[in-house]
Amino acid sequence: MRKDETMEAAAKPLSLKEWVSRGSRVLMGNVTREELVFRKGRGSWLYTTEGDGYLDFLGGVAIHVLGHCHPKVTVAVQKQAQRLLHTSNLYYHEPQILLAEFLVRETFADRVFFANSGTEVVEAAIKLARRFGAAAERFDLLGLEGSFHGRTLGALSLTGQKKIREGIGPIPEGFSWAPYNDFEGVVRKVSPRTAAIFVEPVLGEGGGDSGRSGLPEKTSDLHPGQGDSSCLRRDSDGDCPYGIAFCLSGL
């Protein structure tokens, strides 16, 4: 945007069509966007540049569990922004340690890895699983049909949706998929080269399926070879789906 256009936008309200037109010229078309331009959010409501209110059932793709601009969250962000915004992961800082201690205390975890996105977490889990299996030359990873793990190359390769993987050429080797509600099908796919099985305890994009066959529980106990592991990924349908902090805690 040129400087004069920026000043013009600040001085004169733009119409919805004008904002959409300008956005479509400069933003990548990696997703299909609705022709809505939001200016603010309060609680469960989003408000457009033209003042129309929309009840938000999407929640930032199921992450705004406290709603928009929750007063306590807003104050906490403001206070931290006045103290410290970023140091890198080469140092400790107080909120980082306090949050990690809380997560270890309240969940199944022994240690915490903080990341910027879900796909980054999956990439780290892929590397960890292969590192874990390296001594026995076990590098294969088994995903489940209908799953979604992210759009970076490793996470995309693990995703069990053909349409997501189309158009990018050959994916890295070592990835395969089994039906979600078929434990015997999972067992048939496991081989001596399997390093890990990736399971969404609640299949998000696959229809909110929580495993009618008890697949997540059974898979977490599956150890066909010495040192096999399961990677259980938190679903993207929001936390506390079963009234506990993480559905993984019940597995």
Each language-model region and where it sits:
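PLP-dependent aminotransferase-class I/II
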Residues: 146-203, 207-215
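Hydrophobic "anchor" residues on beta-strands that sit immediately upstream
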Residues: 52, 196, 228-230
